[in-house]
Amino acid sequence: LLVVDASAMARSAAAVVHGYSTFDPRVRVGGVVLNRVGSDAHERMLREALSPLGVPVLGALRRDGRLAAPERHLGLVPAAERRRAAGEAVRRLGEVIGRRLDLEGVLRLARSAGPLEGEPWSPEAPGPPPPGARVAVASGPAFSFLYEENLELLRGAGAELLFFDPASSEGLPEGAGALYLGGGFPEVYAAELSENRPLREAVRLFAAAGRPVVAECGGLLYLARSLDGREMCGVLDAGARMTGRLTLGYRRARALSGSSLAEAGTEVRGHEFHYSAVEPAAGERPAWEVEGRGPEGFVAGGVHASYLHLHWAARPQMPRRLVRAAAGVGA
């Protein structure tokens, strides 16, 4: 099912659909949905242009600013920061789709697809889980960028997840054996994070005791001494600042030393997406050797901190390693 942004198209929409339909013979385009259509006349022109292709048009959605999601420096403003507006937009979108899409046609198209190849993905780890593993996970608006599958993999490896908000929680969750500080927007909430001194001190002491701490991107900034002059946790001997320059791209990397997350030599693929810099970019024991870019990140005691966002389903041994460390079993 191909969704086409038709806002600036008429007959050229047919060229786009024809290109997608013929580019890869393994892919069958079984239907088209036209998005951001301007008017009835615009829709008629689009349908007439597409008719000779024989690809059914299963719907046409009108341009509607009330359905647009606001943007800022790292993409869309998260739904967690605009729950009421986001909920209303989803409700309205459902009404529009119900009126303007051939939902029965979409279902028929889905049923016509062949079976997927390969084994279904499962977050469950083989073998018995280590007892008593509890992982504290940073949440709240400052740390809202997490792959849900990463959390499923932690649970599948036997961990109980304990959520806390670094901007407002008074302390770390009781009984936590490891910390997971994901990505997010610490720069937007730097004042709140800095003002929560008891929580910052709890994180610092947790790391100083050699306990497992995994941080990526926003979590890396939070572990630094400071972020744009505001005090952070001081776990890492590094300062963080916003630069106004975008760092974006996919990365290949290799773990340079063993840590609470990765065994030395582990190869991963991930991505970076930020407007910040950490100085120095790597510690005495870097987390990764990034292909074409050099050493990056920090490994110190139980801490593994890096800019790389990783989807752990590609390396399920990593969340299992973290859960074992949280349970005190060892890697």
Each predicted region: which residue ranges?
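Internal gly/pro-rich beta-alpha loop/helix module
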Residues: 10-127
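Cysteine-nucleophile active-site neighborhood
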Residues: 186-261
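Phosphate-binding active sites in nucleotide-utilizing proteins
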Residues: 131-208
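Short, solvent-exposed amphipathic alpha-helical segments in soluble enzyme
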Residues: 17-20, 47-51, 150-156, 178, ...
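Short, glycine-/Ser/Thr-/acidic-enriched flexible segments
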Residues: 140-143, 168, 185-187, 220-221, ...
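Inter-motif core of Ras-like GTPase G domains
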Residues: 1-7
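Short, surface-exposed connector motifs at secondary-structure boundaries
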Residues: 1, 25-31, 132-134
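C-terminal and late-domain segments of enzyme folds
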Residues: 128-131, 144-156, 160-162, 245-252, ...
